[in-house]
């Protein structure tokens, strides 16, 4: 079985980001990503720090904004950042405080700066096959499959999870690669048998070790998007110990989808800066 090392793939993408950041700098442009952090959630803070640290290594300027208080104040912060011509990309960390929805927040992010595909218009453009930034986690799934040379065209793909951040957008991205996609969720009947027919399984539910060996046909590729912190550390949707004896390829947790997601946010920021 191949373990699909997201860290090494992220490093490859990072070399491209460094080169492009240097070209922009030579033209007098500093690619800048604004991270809006309206929550005191420790995991969100931790991830914001990872983004900031990674950005610094590849030549992208990262600025953290920590608005607190009423939803209106948070939206005002997003509007201020959106109007700043020196900012090229914007992401808003979740969970959001009460009184704010992802849709409302996304509508305040201009699509040209929406490097994590949070604006509903970005998802709509994705569905229509128009240029847009896809949510970075969903894009990371396709990036990993592409770099691992796992064929998507004609492949049967089972996506477990139908959320707007991963399940729906990754299904659209896979359809664009000519895959045959089945979306499964909590109401799906016969989930195990459906998954077992797939050449590729993408699981994004947040339910630890949901996907066992019985889900996986021999040789299938399994992309584990789930991340849950337990007393023993991070675990994913996939029971890696069981699945590794059956799958042909598997992303680890941690070290799989996560590092690629972070680097794609920075690559998107570069692309947004280039288009500005």
From Swiss-Prot:
Pathway: One-carbon metabolism; tetrahydrofolate interconversion. NADP(+) binds at residues 161-163, 186, 227. It catalyses: (6R)-5,10-methylene-5,6,7,8-tetrahydrofolate + NADP(+) = (6R)-5,10-methenyltetrahydrofolate + NADPH; (6R)-5,10-methenyltetrahydrofolate + H2O = (6R)-10-formyltetrahydrofolate + H(+). Its EC number is 1.5.1.5, 3.5.4.9. GO terms for biological process: L-histidine biosynthetic process; methionine biosynthetic process; purine nucleotide biosynthetic process; tetrahydrofolate interconversion. GO terms for molecular function: methenyltetrahydrofolate cyclohydrolase activity; methylenetetrahydrofolate dehydrogenase (NADP+) activity. Keywords: Amino-acid biosynthesis, Histidine biosynthesis, Hydrolase, Methionine biosynthesis, Multifunctional enzyme, NADP, One-carbon metabolism, Oxidoreductase, Purine biosynthesis. CDD domains: NAD_bind_m-THF_DH_Cyclohyd (cd01080). Signal peptide: none annotated. One of its GO terms (cellular component) is cytosol. Catalyzes the oxidation of 5,10-methylenetetrahydrofolate to 5,10-methenyltetrahydrofolate and then the hydrolysis of 5,10-methenyltetrahydrofolate to 10-formyltetrahydrofolate. This is Bifunctional protein FolD 1. The lineage of its organism: Bacteria, Bacillati, Actinomycetota, Actinomycetes, Frankiales.
């Amino acid at each position: 079985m191949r373990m699909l090392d997201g860290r090494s793939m992220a490093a490859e993408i990072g070399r491209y980001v460094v080169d492009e950041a240097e070209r922009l700098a030579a033209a007098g442009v500093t690619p800048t990503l604004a991270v809006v952090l309206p929550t005191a959630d420790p995991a969100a803070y931790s991830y914001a720090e990872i983004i900031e640290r990674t950005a610094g290594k590849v030549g992208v300027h990262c600025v953290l904004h920590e608005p607190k208080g009423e939803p209106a104040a948070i939206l005002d912060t997003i509007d201020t950042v959106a109007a700043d011509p020196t900012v090229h990309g914007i992401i808003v960390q979740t969970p959001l405080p009460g009184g704010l929805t992802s849709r409302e927040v996304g509508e305040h992010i201009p699509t040209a700066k929406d490097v994590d595909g949070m604006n509903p218009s970005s998802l709509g453009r994705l569905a229509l096959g128009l240029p847009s930034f896809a949510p970075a986690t969903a894009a990371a799934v396709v990036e990993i499959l592409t770099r691992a040379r796992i064929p998507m065209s004609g492949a049967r793909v089972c996506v477990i999870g139908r959320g707007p951040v991963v399940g729906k957008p990754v299904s659209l991205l896979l359809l664009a690669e000519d895959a045959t996609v089945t979306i499964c969720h909590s109401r799906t009947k016969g989930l195990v048998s459906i998954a077992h027919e797939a050449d590729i399984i993408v699981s994004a539910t947040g339910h630890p070790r949901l996907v066992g060996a019985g889900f996986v046909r021999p040789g299938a590729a399994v992309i584990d998007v789930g991340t849950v912190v337990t007393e023993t550390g991070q675990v994913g949707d996939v029971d890696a110990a069981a699945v590794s004896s059956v799958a042909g390829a598997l992303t680890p947790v941690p070290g799989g989808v996560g590092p690629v997601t972070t680097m794609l946010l920075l690559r998107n920021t570069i692309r947004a800066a280039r288009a500005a």
